[in-house]
C-alpha cells in the first residue's frame, strides 16, 4: 500500500488524534498526557520505547517549572486518561521519548524529531475558530496548541504506524524522537546531550504552518534559524517611603528601566542579523513604595552562534551596569538556548526530488528561511558533526492566524499531506 493510500485509509483516525491532542494542550516539561498517549501508541505498534531519564541528560534541562506545578500537571494528566505508570516514569520534567524499530537487513539509521508542547495562550472562543465550533477547543486554562505541535505529534504517529505496518519492506533502523519543551528552546539540548542522535545517519526535523504564502507547499530546508538565548534578570534593591525617605531607597525599577532602554540600544552586528527583545518587565507594589524588585524576561538572537554570543555579553554588561548605577544587586538565569542550525544542502536537494513527484503540493521549494529559532538545531548540528546529514523541513499550511495567536489553526489536509511526504521520505531511505 502506498503512503498516500495508507493516509487516506486512516484519515478519520488521524484527524481525531490531532483534535484530541489539541483539546488537551500541555506547556513545556508538562506534556504528561500527550507523552503518555504517544508512548502507549508507539508501544502498541511494536517499537522499542525508551523514555524519561533514559533519554535525557537531566542537568541540561532548561526552564523547568516548579515541582508544585509539575505535580499538579501529572495528577491532571492521569485524571484525563494518561497511563499512570508512564506518567510516573516521565514525572517531574522528564517527558521525552525515543522510539526505535530495527528492520531486516543493513541500512541507515534514520531519525525524525517531533515536538509536543503547547503555548501559554488563551484559545479563542469565536464561532469562526474551527476548534471552538468543532468542540475541540483547549480545555486547559491559558494553554493552547498555537504552533501546530498537536499536528506534529499526529504526523509523527502517522509515520510510525505506516512504517510499523510495512516493516517487512524496509532495511535499517527508524528512530522517532518526541521532544518536550521546544517553546522557549528548553528541551532538545538535554536529549542531544544524552546521545540520542549520536548513531544517526540521516536526521529530519519539521514544522507545519508559518504563513499563507507557504500554503500547500513543502519546503525541504530552513536556512533561517537564528541562535537564541532566553534570560531572566532580577534586580534587588531596598524599598522606602517614596515621600518620607526616598534617599534611603535603592530603586530596582529604575535599574530595570535603565537596563531595558540600553538593552534595546545595543549596536547591531555587521556580520548578520541580531535581535534583542525585553518581553516582560515586572516591578512595583504601590504608588508610594519605592520598588525593591524588578524582573526582566528577555531574549537575544543572532544569525550565527557567535553573533548571539555578542548580544549576550553586551546584555550582561548592561544589566550589571544598570544595577551598579542604582546601587542594586542582580542575578541572571538562563531559561533556554539554542545554537544556529546547520543544514546538509545535498540532503535537502534529495528530499526535493523525492517529494516533488508526489503531486500533492503546489510547490516544493528547496528552502524557506523563516527567521525564527528552533532547538532542533541541537540534533541537526550533532548529527552533522558526527558525519551524518540533516535537514529541517516545513509543511506549509493555510493557517487562520499567526503562530502563537488565539485564533491559530492549521488546515488538516496539509497535515495529512505532510504525513504522506514524511512517509515517502522515510521509505526512500529505508528501502
Stretches with model-predicted labels:
Residues 2-145, 158, 169-170:
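Acidic/His- and Gly-rich active-site-bordering loop/insert found
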Residues 21, 42, 112, 149, ...:
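Divalent metal-coordination and catalytic microenvironments
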Amino acid at each position: 500500500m502506498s503512503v498516500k493510500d495508507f493516509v487516506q485509509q486512516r484519515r478519520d483516525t488521524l484527524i481525531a488524534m490531532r483534535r484530541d491532542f489539541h483539546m488537551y494542550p500541555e506547556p513545556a516539561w508538562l506534556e504528561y498526557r500527550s507523552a503518555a498517549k504517544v508512548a502507549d501508541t508507539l508501544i502498541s505498534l511494536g517499537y522499542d520505547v525508551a523514555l524519561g531519564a533514559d533519554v535525557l541528560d537531566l542537568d541540561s534541562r532548561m526552564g523547568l517549572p516548579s515541582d508544585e506545578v509539575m505535580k499538579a500537571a501529572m495528577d491532571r494528566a492521569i485524571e484525563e486518561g494518561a497511563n499512570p505508570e508512564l506518567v510516573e516514569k516521565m514525572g517531574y520534567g522528564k517527558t521525552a521519548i525515543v522510539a526505535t524499530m530495527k528492520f531486516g537487513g543493513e541500512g541507515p539509521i534514520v531519525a525524525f524529531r517531533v515536538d509536543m508542547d503547547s503555548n501559554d495562550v488563551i484559545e479563542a472562543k469565536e464561532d469562526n475558530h474551527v476548534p471552538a465550533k468543532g468542540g475541540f477547543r483547549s480545555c486547559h486554562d491559558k494553554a493552547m496548541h498555537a504552533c501546530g505541535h498537536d499536528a506534529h505529534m499526529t504526523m509523527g504517529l502517522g509515520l510510525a504506524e505506516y512504517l510499523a505496518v510495512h516493516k517487512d519492506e524496509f532495511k535499517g533502523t527508524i528512530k522517532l524522537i518526541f521532544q518536550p519543551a521546544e517553546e522557549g528552546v528548553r528541551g532538545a539540548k538535554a536529549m542531544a546531550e544524552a546521545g540520542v542522535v549520536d548513531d544517526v545517519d540521516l536526521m529530519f526535523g519539521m514544522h507545519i504552518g508559518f504563513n499563507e504564502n507557504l500554503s500547500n507547499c513543502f519546503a525541504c530546508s530552513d536556512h533561517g534559524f537564528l541562535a537564541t538565548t532566553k534570560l531572566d534578570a532580577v534586580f534587588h534593591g531596598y524599598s522606602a517611603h517614596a515621600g518620607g525617605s526616598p534617599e534611603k531607597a535603592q530603586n530596582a525599577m529604575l535599574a530595570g528601566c535603565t537596563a531595558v532602554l540600553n538593552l534595546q540600544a545595543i549596536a547591531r552586528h555587521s556580520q548578520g542579523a541580531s535581535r534583542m527583545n525585553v518581553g516582560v518587565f515586572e516591578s512595583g507594589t504601590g504608588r508610594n513604595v519605592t520598588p525593591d524588585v524588578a524582573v526582566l524576561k528577555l531574549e537575544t538572537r543572532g544569525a550565527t552562534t557567535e553573533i548571539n554570543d555578542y548580544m549576550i555579553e553586551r546584555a550582561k554588561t548592561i544589566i550589571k551596569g544598570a544595577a551598579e548605577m542604582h546601587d542594586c544587586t542582580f542575578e541572571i538565569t538562563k531559561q533556554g538556548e539554542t545554537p544556529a542550525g546547520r543544514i546538509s544542502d545535498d540532503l535537502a536537494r534529495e528530499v526535493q526530488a523525492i517529494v516533488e513527484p508526489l503531486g500533492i503540493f503546489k510547490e516544493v521549494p528547496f528552502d524557506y528561511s523563516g527567521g525564527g529559532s528552533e532547538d532542533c538545531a541541537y540534533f541537526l548540528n550533532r548529527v552533522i558533526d558526527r558525519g551524518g546529514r540533516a535537514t529541517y523541513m516545513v509543511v506549509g499550511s493555510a493557517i487562520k492566524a499567526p503562530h502563537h495567536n488565539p485564533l491559530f489553526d492549521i488546515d488538516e489536509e496539509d497535515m495529512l499531506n505532510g504525513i504522506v511526504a514524511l512517509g515517502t521520505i522515510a521509505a526512500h531511505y529505508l528501502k
